[in-house]
Amino acid sequence: MAAKLELLIAQTILQGFDAQYGRFLEVTAGAQQRFERADWPAVQQAMKKRIHLYDHHVGLVVEQLKCITGQQYFDADFPSRVKAVYTDLLPEYPRFEIAESFFNSVYCRLFRHRDLTPEKLFVFSSQPEGRFRDIPRPLSRDFTANGDVSAMLYNLLTDLPLRLPWENLSRDIDYITLALQQSFSAQQLAGATFQIANELFYRNKAAWLVGKLRVADRVYPFLLPIHHSDSGALFIDTCLTSKAEASIVFGFARSYFMVYAPLPAAMVEWLREILPGKTTAELYMAIGCQKHGKTECYREYLTFMSGSQEQFIIAPGVKGMVMLVFTLPSFDRVFKVIKDEFAPQKEVTQAQVMACYQLVKEHDRVGRMADTQEYENFVVDKARLSPELLAELQREVPDKLEDLGDRIAIRHLYMERRMTPLNLYLEQADEQQMRDAIEEYGNAIKQLAAANIFPGDMLFKNFGVTRHGRVVFYDYDEICYMTEVNFRDIPPPRYPEDELASEPWYSVSPNDVFPEEFRHFLCGDRRIRQVFEEMHRDLFEADYWRGLQQRIRDGHVEDVFAYRKKRRFSQRSGAALPATSATA
């Protein structure tokens, strides 16, 4: 009887995962229709819906299991036996890796993230690594130039499943051909093979054609973002063939792609060749499997720890008033714990901070907000904590610590990609690096605002610089929707004495923001002030912010590109493409 119960529980969990991934694919499959209809609000709703599906189905399975087991008492080894039976169901299962993560989620929900051991959880996968390369059907089609790149591109583009007309296909083919000729010789292109993914990758207002360009013994990305013109016809905005550009397109600060992937492991392996700098976790997250990406992220952390003797240290930079942040010197992640008590000037609660982080997870991050992974009961050996960090943890987050003898459990934390804090970057930057960073910072603010996100605290210390030189926001405790903010001009002083007073001569409500004040706390450095005034003076004007608010209220969804403005065909070729409301 007991063995039958363990099998029933294992089958219930796997069937629950089947239901979840079926709904995941169903929402994903609707991406083409949403794109063709230019239904951008539906795109945003689908993104949130797909993220919520996982936790919803975990909850359904947990309730089923409670009904199955009732009030029965089980011995301590019962969860281990269920895991063993579940493992036996996976060798022939096509999505075994995410099914393991789903099992972990159900276990954690049932047992409140306690007793997280390899005997009861899939800390590492139970299946051989080679299974990731078992592809039952090709994920891509091959196209060869045979000396005529334009003809090959015509065949490739007219073979796409999109049902909208092209605005000017011959023009786009000329643009792509020119871009290829600027990067490769005629001889290289004549013998090149283009491997094009069968599925388009949808995100925001674009459908991405993703491919591999094989030239001799080398492989390059081949990425074409397809957009709508104002008249509803299709056009291609650029052609990207460098791995650095591809890495940014699939970056950790962007929303997850909608790509139909019934075999996600196969898709991840296919992408790896053109995204060699991405970890397995990042690739799963890029295609929308963020919960399994979280599992892989933890596995990458464990692998690093097993091969290193480094101690955790307090992260470099200005200490936060809300978050305690620590890291490992050679690891590319930071760990963020919400402090038990905040500085007096921070009028937020822990629940509000967590809600802000969830908002970022669900919102269009437009390449400007870092993704985070949330963990509970994160166990660390005390010997791996520097004395300074251990003292800081005991001082700032004692309510979130559980002493386990030689180890310590942190009840809740976020893991996030490590970046160079912008304030530290600017201290070391030369003139050109400083100009580039300020341009990026202003663009980040504007793109977030266009996506209906107001950062709140805009100090440089709350932004980071990635290895590609992009500026990304990572401090979320004060973010809110743009439409919730009241942007005001500072009223003129009534008397000369007003300007000398310690208190403002005008009333200030909680949601009031005065953009004129940004100049004072952002532009203390004369060099930075000059560049800021040159590039982003509009950020100091309340009218600019109110104009953005009105566009949002009117239902306008901005175009945000995953590449610099100068990479657009309209900029590179000197020819006009259809007008878009870009904030690139």
Swiss-Prot record:
Reaction it catalyzes: L-seryl-[isocitrate dehydrogenase] + ATP = O-phospho-L-seryl-[isocitrate dehydrogenase] + ADP + H(+)
Subcellular location: Cytoplasm
Binding-site residues, ATP: A315, P316, G317, V318, K319, G320, M321, K336
GO molecular function: [isocitrate dehydrogenase (NADP+)] kinase activity; AMP binding; ATP binding; phosphoprotein phosphatase activity; protein serine/threonine kinase activity
Highest taxon above the source species: Bacteria
Pfam families reported in the protein's UniProt record: AceK_kinase (PF06315), AceK_regulatory (PF20423)
Residues at the catalytic site: D371
Keyword Translocase included in the entry's annotation: no
Keyword ATP-binding: yes
InterPro entries to which the protein is assigned, alphabetical: AceK_kinase, AceK_regulatory, Isocitrate_DH_AceK
Cystine connections: none
GO BP, one annotated term: glucose metabolic process
Annotated keywords: ATP-binding, Cytoplasm, Glyoxylate bypass, Hydrolase, Kinase, Nucleotide-binding, Protein phosphatase, Serine/threonine-protein kinase, Transferase, Tricarboxylic acid cycle
An annotated GO cellular component: cytoplasm
Enzyme Commission no: 2.7.11.5, 3.1.3.-
Family: Belongs to the AceK family.
Known role: Bifunctional enzyme which can phosphorylate or dephosphorylate isocitrate dehydrogenase (IDH) on a specific serine residue. This is a regulatory mechanism which enables bacteria to bypass the Krebs cycle via the glyoxylate shunt in response to the source of carbon. When bacteria are grown on glucose, IDH is fully active and unphosphorylated, but when grown on acetate or ethanol, the activity of IDH declines drastically concomitant with its phosphorylation.
Protein's name in the database: Isocitrate dehydrogenase kinase/phosphatase
Species whose genome carries this gene: Serratia proteamaculans (strain 568)
Gene that this polypeptide is encoded by: aceK
